[in-house]
Amino acid sequence: MMENGGYVGQYGGEENYMEQEEEWEREGLLDPAWEKQQKKTFTAWCNSHLRKAGTSIENIEDDFRNGLKLMLLLEVISGETLPKPDRGKMRFHKIANVNKALDFIASKGVKLVSIGAEEIVDGNLKMTLGMIWTIILRFAIQDISVEEMTAKEGLLLWCQRKTAPYKNVNVQNFHLSFKDGLAFCALIHRHRPDLIDYSKLSKDNPLENLNTAFDVAEKYLDIPRMLDPDDLINTPKPDERAIMTYVSCYYHAFQGAQQPGSTPFVIHLTKTGLSYRFFVRLFAAETAANRICKVLKVNQENERLMEEYERLASDLLEWIRRTMPWLNSRQSDSTLAGVQKKLEEYRTYRRKHKPPRVEQKAKLETNFNTLQTKLRLSNRPAYMPTEGKMVSDITNSWKGLEHAEKAFEEWLLAETMRLERLEHLAQKFKHKADTHEDWTKGKEEMLQSQDFRNCKLNELKALKKKHEAFESDLAAHQDRVEQIAAIAQELNTLEYHDCASVNARCQRICDQWDRLGALTQRRRQGLDEAERILEKIDLLHLEFAKRAAPFNNWLDGAREDLVDMFIVHTMEEIQGLIQAHDQFKATLGEADKEFNVIIGLVRDAEAIVKQEQVPGGLVNPYTTLSADLISRKWSEVRALVPQRDQTLANELRKQQNNEMLRRQFAEKANAVGPWIERQMDAVTAIGMGISGSLEEQLHRLKEYEQAVYAYKPSIEELEKIHQAVQESMIFENRYTHYTMETLRVGWEQLLTSINRNINEVENQILTRDSKGITQEQLTEFRSSFNHFDKNRTGRLAPEEFKSCLVSLGYSIGKDKQGDMDFQRILAVVDPNASGYVQFDAFLDFMTRESTDTDTAEQVIDSFRILASDRPYILPDELRRELPPDQAEYCIQRMPPYKGPNAIPGALDYMSFSTALYGESDL
């Protein structure tokens, strides 16, 4: 697997080796130095095989792109024939060929991940190197086997064995261990000492060592130069794959050529001219050494198995000897807990302690059989264990152990069942006794309690019901007490180990049961007597409550009526109050009788409570009222009656005086009010301009003004009467509908109307004279205005104003343009946006429309004449043509002219003129 190269290779049957490969590939990304080494090494390795087919490659990422040489390489190294390649040059032909090669690799049990034909065809160097490395692993390294180690570990062990005798060589890996070249030289010298004089090599000269090894391997061993000495020396950590590839060539060269009589061996001797006898001796020595090592290793393993058997047998037999007494013991403390503890110990023994011994016995038998088989196969005599440790001895001891286990377990289960039955009976006794004692807790104290002597009647009845329920419960518990006694008797019969405590507890329960019966009867008698006394007191309390509640309500109502702070405004009201008070006084006799009955009920209850000494007997549960409260309220009511008589008499005199003031005010107001209304109607008629000229209207208005001021003393006299009415707090007067406020408002409105109408008439005269309109025109305008002033308010709403204009012949369209024109007219007649049009504004607008008036355009034309048709005017021209004060007025208010061709001091008369008529922002 190669993460940085983007591929994963795995072979079936070599999972351990491929897992190691995965670990190698996790170290990091493929750096440029390693990539360069791999490219050079893999290219040389491929060429070493391709030359057998008469071809080679120059650039590994390009020459395999069409897939042809890749398929040829696989055929050479596998000795098998691949499918016929596609000969086209199109991309899909190349992909098809590469896929055939990849399929062949996969058929050899190699799992390819992330390696696709497209990457190889595209010349992806990392993918190509990864693919070649996968091929090298499968066809050059995987089959290496040294002492049950395969692939990388086998190749590394082979290197270590071969180089062990050599100085300065310590092969631990496939990168740094080969960096100085001595390991390569040692491998060659070990197999071909005639090719290298190892004693002359130095660790301090790695370049010479590497060149020597590579040259000798290429010249005499037919191993091409796959590594560059400079790259190995200058790289801190040379590429492991490149070195493994090169070292695997050494392995195949030496292992394939070492067999005497083999064709490669004979050809090799022929090429080198060396002695055949020399290599036979060399091979024989190595074979003899290997045979001795193998025999010694077998003998050592057999001795180890014998020692282990003796140790395991002794340990197992000793454990059985220690365990048997415990299994044969039948001692018990006759308690269920003790037997259950023994049973749990036995289960722990079966669960934790025995399983390892079962495994130990099985291992012992397996080791014995294995040992005997190995001895037989190696022609050794059979193994005889020491006395008492034969397999049969162990089997017999084991059977005895299992028999003891079975008997011990059966005894434990039987004893457990017996004690469980007895313990169940004891637990049943305990449970029933506990339940009974829990039920009886507090019962004696409850029955001896005198709590009912401090109870009210309802509480006492509840206690009596509760006691009746307890008596029923007591009768129901009689069966439980009998069951407890029966169980105790049975435990005694069965000789329960703790019978003493059972009997003592049973006796306590029976004694307590007798006491509870006596106390129950005594408490019932006490409850009955207390109920009789409280019922008698309760009847008195109930009667008191029935009478006291309505009487108390009557007292509260009477007291409220007597102290009521009444407010009256008429004689009828005060007379009604006096009549109601007289009726109340007539009921006081019956009330006094009821009061005496109520107080008598309380005294009777007090006598019984004192005689029977009933705690809390004076507390009435039916009411919160008391005799003292009723007595106090009755005394208060009797004292308030004469006070109420005096208050009503005083109020009667006050109302008689108020009636006189009402009549005086009404007489005067009924005269003033109509007079003000008549004057207001006359002034309004004049203001409407219905008849007469403006001068006549003005004359009549001034006459009315004099008459109104002459009537003012009557108003002042009415104010004095009103002041007296206010001081007497009189707010209503049935003799007149006029109030002082309405008369004041009417008087002020009259004065205001006269002044306003005088001002309007004077303004109309001024407008008529200045505009030159005739009396007929003025009358027409007034008539139209009055016609649409439906409410006679002296003003028109916008819609009324619009209708008035239309009636006078003013054209206003009903389209959007007409609405815009009307809004402009409204802005003129109602500049403050009050929502109404006064007659003065209406008249001013109509006179503008019907007469020739000055406009902003006329003023602009006049200024243009003074300025000689220029768009601006100079201050000197204004001073020359206008009076001095008016000239200075214009100069101060005219803005500077900012148009084209302006000269210093030029003034803008156009903006000034439009501002005079409110048509600009100036």
From Swiss-Prot:
GO terms classed as biological process: actin cytoskeleton organization; muscle cell development
Every EF-hand domain range: 776-811, 817-852
GO MF, one annotated term: actin filament binding
Subunit structure: Homodimer; antiparallel.
Keyword terms of this UniProt record: Actin-binding, Calcium, Metal-binding, Repeat
A GO CC term assigned to this protein in UniProt: cell junction
Pfam family for this entry, one: CH
Entry protein name: Alpha-actinin, sarcomeric
Domain of life: Eukaryota
Gene that encodes it: Actn
Family, as annotated: Belongs to the alpha-actinin family.
PROSITE patterns xref list: ACTININ_1 (PS00019), ACTININ_2 (PS00020), CH (PS50021), EF_HAND_1 (PS00018), EF_HAND_2 (PS50222)
Function: F-actin cross-linking protein which is thought to anchor actin to a variety of intracellular structures. This is a bundling protein.
